[in-house]
């Protein structure tokens, strides 16, 4: 019950309206002023009597049930409720809002009854025509029900024994059973182990505590069986330290441990069963597609191979019919081209498909003599020392190919000699050549000036005048006998004029300086006609040599310059040699 509008006579300026009795008990209004005119006093009496009559009329409509509480509309208008001076006294704002809400709710209820049930009330007389227009324009649907509002405390008390159940509670239960309203009622629980300790610490009345204990074991209505599983993920701390436990944890996860809920387990079982059956069908369908796709792919590959094979075969046939002719290149690039034949194949543009490998023959280019001289000269310079015996011997015989022979152990030169051996064609020896013959490539290298011979060298039995462009004297019989003991590697030469000699001075640095050699065993295979090693006596048949650019002492010399004179005598006489030092 709400008792309202109990008024006390106050002056006109301090008139309070709409304040409840409960608020006035706690907060009494200000005292009455001493100076009050009789006219105002009589006016206050009339106002108070009118407000009392309004309150009596209004109290007949109010009830304890907030849902059915109805208040008369004329009571608000006739009483002239205002809040002009209530801004300073805001004790009853909540109750005023509640009254306004109830008023609005009553108006909507009356309108709904007029729309859907055609019940006419006092409040909806003015809205009758409008509601008829609304119903005529389109149909209306109304859903009736009772709103369940959860109390703010979080729990509600229910009696345990049937005898203690009140009549109002039985009526509400009967209404809920008859109607289609779905309502959930229960008690709010806290999922914590310390709830009992917290509840005991709270100051409660004894009756409330006893009633709560009774409610914990009470069963209101039981319909079916409810099973609830609480699942949680627990991570073991020792999994990071022990690998076995981590493996066990993965196995448990595969098996579905920990259990989640029966519905989830059933769902997993059904999905596994359905997946097996569906996967078999999918595999059978995909097998046909895969086979057809693979057959088409294989057929495409075979066609591509069949197309590419004639092209490659035709290219090979063309290359065999028309041998590859190498273009003329500078002499300094001969070895580079021959060492990389694949670049020539790619540059020839005869092969249409780059991915195929074409192997064909390649004609050999003539040996570049000047480049070979440089390579051998560099090799000998690296390996020779003052006492070494490595030398390059070049023999300038007429109408005879120049031959190279070296005892160098260089792997590069020997490997090239093995791969590409030079031609060993021997030409007939001819001694009838004029001295004014055009000098050859080696003669251009062996240019020099005449060196005066020492006086003691002129005491030989048959002094021979030295000339510049004469041929070397033939090999004597004594030398032939000496050479025969060496082996079949030396070649016999006929006797010629024994009064010829040569003398030269080295002018070009490219010429290899002669040094005495040591007979080494033949480690590398070569033809018998190769003159790789010369005897010391044959080597000393050369004329006096002077080294103006670089002085390298030979065996038995004591100075930086070496002056030697060699004289050859006919008739197989031994060769004499003299040396002079500074």
Curated annotation (Swiss-Prot):
The keyword Chaperone does not apply. Disulfide bonds: none annotated. The keyword Zinc does not apply. Residues 48-67, 563-582 have a biased composition (Polar residues). It holds the Pfam family DUF3719. It comes from the Eukaryota. Its main location: other. Keywords: Cell projection, Ciliopathy, Cilium, Cilium biogenesis/degradation, Disease variant, Joubert syndrome. Residues 28-47 have a biased composition (Basic and acidic residues). One of its GO terms (biological process) is protein localization to cilium. Residues 16-67, 413-438, 485-512, 545-582 are annotated as: Disordered. InterPro entries: DUF3719, FAM149. GO terms for cellular component: cilium. It is found in: Cell projection, Cilium. Interacts with TBC1D32; may play a role in cilium assembly. It is linked to Joubert syndrome 36: A form of Joubert syndrome, a disorder presenting with cerebellar ataxia, oculomotor apraxia, hypotonia, neonatal breathing abnormalities and psychomotor delay. Neuroradiologically, it is characterized by cerebellar vermian hypoplasia/aplasia, thickened and reoriented superior cerebellar peduncles, and an abnormally large interpeduncular fossa, giving the appearance of a molar tooth on transaxial slices (molar tooth sign). Additional variable features include retinal dystrophy, renal disease, liver fibrosis, and polydactyly. JBTS36 inheritance is autosomal recessive. Belongs to the FAM149 family. Involved in the localization of proteins to the cilium and cilium assembly. Indirectly regulates the signaling functions of the cilium, being required for normal SHH/smoothened signaling and proper development. This is Primary cilium assembly protein FAM149B1. It comes from Homo sapiens.
